[in-house]
Amino acid sequence: MHIDQKVIDEINSKPFTLASRKGVVGLDGFVDKIVAPVEKRHGLGDQFDAVSTIAEMGAKISAAAGKSANIELFPRFEKLGGNGPIMANAMLALGMEIRYIGALGSPMINPVFEEFASKTKAVSLCEPGITTALEFKDGKLMLGNTLSLENIDFATILEKCGEGEFIDLIAHAD
């Protein structure tokens, strides 16, 4: 694709900043738990062979039909997840002032959201959802638990945020 140099020059001549802009973002929040399914153990901790592919995992699950199976999931790390927090972080990176209202933990903010909640002066509505992401060489299989998000409604937003503060946040957002 060819882009005319005049267009490139005009775009480059325009300052791009969102530093003077304010936004309100919500409403979800997920703790992403990244795990490796264990194929064979060789010792404690991370001494194991992981299930390599989604097809191999599918075969293990299919082989358990009519029986039972226990597949160990080795925890690799946890991180912030959810469409709202990811979008809010992107807007923060562009210099916007962001307030976040969403599922970050209750009564305490979940540790994966502490820095984010501080940067956004977040109002947490409920516990976050949980995504357990099984990582393979050929992709991820994400298993989501969204039950806690069923607690999010307008009445809860007003209760946790305060009606006056919520109206003020919305009124002053760009």
Please provide the spans of the model-predicted regions:
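Glycine-rich phosphate/adenosyl-contacting loop at the front of the ribokinase-like
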Residues: M1-R99, M108-P111, T131-A133, L143, ...
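Short acidic (Asp/Glu) patches
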Residues: G82, E115-K119, P128
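Charged interaction/catalytic cores of defense and host-pathogen modules
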Residues: G105-P107, F166
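Active-site-proximal loop->helix
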Residues: P107-V123
